[in-house]
Amino acid sequence: MSSDSLTPKDTIVPEEQTNQLRQPDLDEDSIHYDPEADDLESLETTASYASTSVSAKVYTKKEVNKGTDIESQPHWGENTSSTHDSDKEEDSNEEIESFPEGGFKAWVVTFGCFLGLIACFGLLNSTGVIESHLQDNQLSSESVSTIGWLFSLFLFVCSASCIISGTYFDRNGFRTIMIVGTVFHVAGLFATANSTKYWHFILSFAIVCGFGNGIVLSPLVSVPAHYFFKRRGTALAMATIGGSVGGVVFPIMLRSFFSMKSDTDPTYGFVWGIRTLGFLDLALLTLSIILVKERLPHVIENSKDGESRWRYILRVYILQCFDAKAFLDMKYLFCVLGTVFSELSINSALTYYGSYATSHGISANDAYTLIMIINVCGIPGRWVPGYLSDKFGRFNVAIATLLTLFIVMFVGWLPFGTNLTNMYVISALYGFCSGSVFSLLPVCCGQISKTEEFGKRYSTMYFVVGFGTLVGIPITGAIISIKTTADYQHYIIFCGLATFVSAVCYIISRAYCVGFKWVRF
């Protein structure tokens, strides 16, 4: 940092140079020194020298060598740093050097999360195939909107249950909560396989399986942050690629089973397809439990005097699991709002993507192929932006992908999405951009959160996201209720505007951190 760029009231002086300020004519009574300050604290020195007031921020040698900036809470649009080194993380005062940033154990943990997320996100990406089969078979007597509420409830329970596992993970670690979530996830799938009535599917799939899926999701997304800081975007992108892999493999497997027929049991293919999915998810989640281990110490909160064990559990894991105070942090608040609108947009668009295609004369098989293209292109869509985010900044790349997705929807899909050839291109672009959104948004949340609090903050965010998903899909269904061409155009506009609002929220969140200037953030 050049001394020419400093004003007399904001001088940064290395520790070894501080004696130069203490000339005989200084007013010694105006020098304040904290003898208890350690290597991580700064000393504030104010002196009167040659009739000029000088305020010096004195850093330890360790901090000077690291280029540390100790900053106050930023105001709206304020650029909180006078310089931004190319290799500095702008928003964190954590000991960056303590993160492994790689190594055998770190990548084994990432691979374990990858396997677990194949099961979690793979099921989420297979709901369209399951919905289509139920609409034509077990639930053929129910309306489309009624069946839609089943899957909307599944997504809500999945998102909302993250809040329980996130709090437990921060306090107790990975393994126990993963075992509990795996039991619910697999048991829900086996119960779904034998369901025949609407209320059966509500209990087995939406509630039990949705709860288990959400329970395992939060720890699997949180653990890579324990091993990576500078390369966190790349690591989480590698882990979440499992969602796209599952989104490609699971629907193909389920459609193959669903096509099986039996003279004595018309549900034979569905039953064994869901059971096979349950066995496969059990194997994947078990391997994840074996391979993954958290690194950072747990957040410990002792019980109060005279507090019973059950009152302690109720207070810590139920009443305090929602981090309401986090919303007082404006950068976190707008990050959550941005995630709500992005998830609402993408989930609503994908839920009715096949219906849109068939309404424009595209066959059911080709519509299924378009969905497969989205999932396949989501694989590089998760990795490439994740890698770029470590080079150019997580928020910067996330905002760029959201704006690109908005352009794809308004410039590509809305005017040209009327024939199969165009839809192939649109599906590829949409899959790439939406995949990057899913992998980058948790990283952005992690960047503005302490690592040991990430699980709770992430789960709190997705608890709120669950409400957005719960109402977003039915609203989209109401928009296309008549299924006219104009209805589907309004459906694209609705999803596109939600994407744009998401980008604006992330821009505001970034502004609270570093202002509007171009820096790597």
UniProtKB/Swiss-Prot annotation:
Pfam families: MFS_1. Residues 1-103, 165-172, 222-233, 291-325, 389-396, 444-461, 509-521 are cytoplasmic. Optimum pH is 7.5. The keyword Cell membrane applies. CDD domains: MFS_MCT_SLC16. Glycans are attached at N125, N194, N419. Keywords: Cell membrane, Glycoprotein, Membrane, Transmembrane, Transmembrane helix, Transport. GO terms for molecular function: riboflavin transmembrane transporter activity; transmembrane transporter activity. One of its GO terms (cellular component) is plasma membrane. Residues 1-33, 65-96 are annotated as: Disordered. GO terms for biological process: riboflavin transport. It is a multi-pass membrane protein. Residues 125-143, 194-200, 255-269, 347-367, 418-422, 483-487 are extracellular. Belongs to the major facilitator superfamily. Monocarboxylate porter (TC 2.A.1.13) family. This is Riboflavin transporter MCH5. It comes from Saccharomyces cerevisiae (strain ATCC 204508 / S288c).
